[in-house]
């Protein structure tokens, strides 16, 4: 696995900390951040869904923020429930998906944001 929130060749999402989160969301490329918690059942279901989707999008940054550890990031971004997937570009939120959704919804969203 790679550090700083990058996904490895197996597309496993890394845990973002405050530093890696700030670095990645400010990049010019699309960054997907999954806000989740260890106690959240739907968050656990979402992980393999996103890993599968991300195989088709190797050129985006992707990572996860554990809201129990980094509640400051969740509060800053107005996260009110998990799972929530937020898309950033150049440090700006460009879209958000709340709740567990099918893989196709995430793929379509990423496609629309990359065009």
What are these regions (language model features)?
Residues 77-86:
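Structural micro-motif
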Residues 29, 36-39, 81:
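Short pre-active-site segment immediately N-terminal to redox-active cysteine/selenocysteine motifs
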